[in-house]
Amino acid sequence: MKTVTVRDLVVGEGAPKIIVSLMGKTITDVKSEALAYREADFDILEWRVDHFANVTTAESVLEAAGAIREIITDKPLLFTFRSAKEGGEQALTTGQYIALNRAAVDSGLVDMIDLELFTGDDEVKATVGYAHQHNVAVIMSNHDFHKTPAAEEIVQRLRKMQELGADIPKIAVMPQTKADVLTLLTATVEMQERYADRPIITMSMSKTGVISRLAGEVFGSAATFGAVKKASAPGQISVADLRTVLTILHQA
């Protein structure tokens, strides 16, 4: 299975990489959060731009991205607009969403973008191609904050992301029972062992699903999300605790 290298970080080998999310509403908030994150032990910084108030003003978005890059210079920067329908803070039209991601790619400030699987196959394929032309990697994602689909459906979605050109397919689902967590882990193993030719990221959310955030190296998930201050999704734990557990499992 091939790995994905972003800056000097190799995703898909060794312990799962830790992603943290920056969620400031204004440029001032973004700068102060980035400064607070500078000393934290993480691997990838995700900017959740759907939390940013001026998201429809390209100049403001790029100014904020530039400010983040000036403060955190050495970590890969993942640009993510999480749509309202997948648990995000705002809604954009498909045209606005694609234009925003293309502007991020054009800026030269970001290393990765997040593209939601269900944006539309043609739009997704074209944007993946555009990102790759500019040496920007693509995490393709799907989120279900209500339930855990059947393992077969989870695998099917991850395989479709791979077919659409994602560098890293990602899915996050909500467990209603402990068995739902096992469904997610089973799907992860099946995808990783039978179909994946690149790293994948999977997680079962909430307190019930925490084990999935910790045991990625065992089951086949290449990255996990942790919290520096405020969690960006249910079930995230602090980056310090996360690093400790990931290291223990890696060295076992």
From Swiss-Prot:
<feature type="binding site">
    <location>
        <position position="213"/>
    </location>
    <ligand>
        <name>3-dehydroquinate</name>
    </ligand>
</feature>
<dbReference type="GO" id="GO:0046279">
    <property type="term" value="P:3,4-dihydroxybenzoate biosynthetic process"/>
</dbReference>
<feature type="binding site">
    <location>
        <position position="21"/>
    </location>
    <ligand>
        <name>3-dehydroquinate</name>
    </ligand>
</feature>
<dbReference type="GO" id="GO:0008652">
    <property type="term" value="P:amino acid biosynthetic process"/>
</dbReference>
<dbReference type="Pfam" id="PF01487">
    <property type="entry name" value="DHquinase_I"/>
</dbReference>
<dbReference type="InterPro" id="IPR001381">
    <property type="entry name" value="DHquinase_I"/>
</dbReference>
<comment type="similarity">
    <text>Belongs to the type-I 3-dehydroquinase family.</text>
</comment>
<dbReference type="InterPro" id="IPR050146">
    <property type="entry name" value="Type-I_3-dehydroquinase"/>
</dbReference>
<feature type="binding site">
    <location>
        <position position="82"/>
    </location>
    <ligand>
        <name>3-dehydroquinate</name>
    </ligand>
</feature>
<keyword id="KW-0028">Amino-acid biosynthesis</keyword>
<feature type="binding site">
    <location>
        <position position="232"/>
    </location>
    <ligand>
        <name>3-dehydroquinate</name>
    </ligand>
</feature>
<protein>
    <recommendedName>
        <fullName>3-dehydroquinate dehydratase</fullName>
        <ecNumber>4.2.1.10</ecNumber>
    </recommendedName>
</protein>
<comment type="pathway">
    <text>Metabolic intermediate biosynthesis; chorismate biosynthesis; chorismate from D-erythrose 4-phosphate and phosphoenolpyruvate: step 3/7.</text>
</comment>
<feature type="active site" description="Proton donor/acceptor">
    <location>
        <position position="143"/>
    </location>
</feature>
<comment type="subunit">
    <text>Homodimer.</text>
</comment>
<keyword id="KW-0704">Schiff base</keyword>
<dbReference type="GO" id="GO:0009423">
    <property type="term" value="P:chorismate biosynthetic process"/>
</dbReference>
<dbReference type="GO" id="GO:0003855">
    <property type="term" value="F:3-dehydroquinate dehydratase activity"/>
</dbReference>
<dbReference type="InterPro" id="IPR018508">
    <property type="entry name" value="3-dehydroquinate_DH_AS"/>
</dbReference>
<keyword id="KW-0057">Aromatic amino acid biosynthesis</keyword>
<dbReference type="InterPro" id="IPR013785">
    <property type="entry name" value="Aldolase_TIM"/>
</dbReference>
<comment type="function">
    <text>Involved in the third step of the chorismate pathway, which leads to the biosynthesis of aromatic amino acids. Catalyzes the cis-dehydration of 3-dehydroquinate (DHQ) and introduces the first double bond of the aromatic ring to yield 3-dehydroshikimate.</text>
</comment>
<feature type="active site" description="Schiff-base intermediate with substrate">
    <location>
        <position position="170"/>
    </location>
</feature>
<dbReference type="GO" id="GO:0009073">
    <property type="term" value="P:aromatic amino acid family biosynthetic process"/>
</dbReference>
<keyword id="KW-0456">Lyase</keyword>
<feature type="binding site">
    <location>
        <begin position="46"/>
        <end position="48"/>
    </location>
    <ligand>
        <name>3-dehydroquinate</name>
    </ligand>
</feature>
<feature type="binding site">
    <location>
        <position position="236"/>
    </location>
    <ligand>
        <name>3-dehydroquinate</name>
    </ligand>
</feature>
